[in-house]
Design a protein with these regions (language model features):
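Active-site core of glycosidic bond-cleaving carbohydrate-active enzymes
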Residues: 1-9, 13-20, 27, 31-32, ...
Length: 217
């Protein structure tokens, strides 16, 4: 789009061609038929690594790598999985993944599981809900909310988004808790497990205010 608007026609054609190829390859490469959602990555051995990533699927849908007709069943699966695993407290944000990341998919194993979610058990369960191993956060939660608005699922989008707005209003995505860890990453019971204190990515969901506004015009 930028190249086209600047009159760089050759660049625009190049990028459009590559975008088309990426779009055609993305679904067949990453959609996991066993779960009905997009995996996080495919390793060199061909194996899909799928931990029910909410942000991966949200980003892909938001940026048009998945058609709306294919996006709706993906979102249905993610919402159903959230219910199945018992995640309901959207005032804490949205977990980046809904099942534990296995130990074998981590590179470093130096910290206790409850610090950064790095597991010691092979199935990853001891690190689950901590930091980027299923911790609840507003970081990149925007894309799940945006994807729901984009395909016309207003009620579902609001169910996730409105509790987060209440937390933004009270400053609950910034600062530190009594344990010295910050509020930008929490376990599902609200315990703090972040370290930055003010994670700017956590404020992306506020962009969805414009999507909500569009639904009311």
């Amino acid at each position: 789009d930028v190249a086209r608007k600047l009159g760089h026609t050759e660049d625009a054609a190049f990028f459009a061609d590559r975008a088309g190829k990426l779009r055609r390859a993305y679904g067949p490469t990453f959609l996991n038929p066993a779960t009905g959602v997009l995996a996080g990555w495919r390793s060199t051995d061909g194996q899909l690594h799928d931990y029910w990533f909410t942000f991966v699927n949200g980003v892909a849908i938001t940026y048009g790598l998945v058609d709306d007709k294919d996006a709706r069943p993906i979102l249905d699966q993610l919402l159903a999985k959230m219910t199945a695993v018992g995640y309901t407290n959207f005032e804490l944000g949205i977990p980046g993944n809904l099942v534990p990341v296995r130990k074998g998919d981590y590179i470093f194993h130096d910290n206790p599981p409850e610090v950064f979610g790095v597991p010691r058990l092979e199935d990853g369960s001891d690190g689950f809900q901590y930091y980027e191993n299923g911790g609840a956060t507003a970081c990149y939660a925007y894309f799940m909310v945006k994807a729901l608005y984009q395909v016309g699922r207003k009620a579902d989008a609001r169910r996730l988004f409105e509790p987060m707005l209440r937390s933004f209003a009270t400053g609950d995505f910034q600062g530190f808790c009594d344990n010295g860890m910050s509020k930008d990453w929490r376990d599902w019971h609200g315990g703090c497990h972040g370290y930055e204190g003010f994670l700017v990515d956590s404020f992306l969901p506020l962009l969805a205010v414009f999507d909500e506004w569009e639904t009311r015009r």
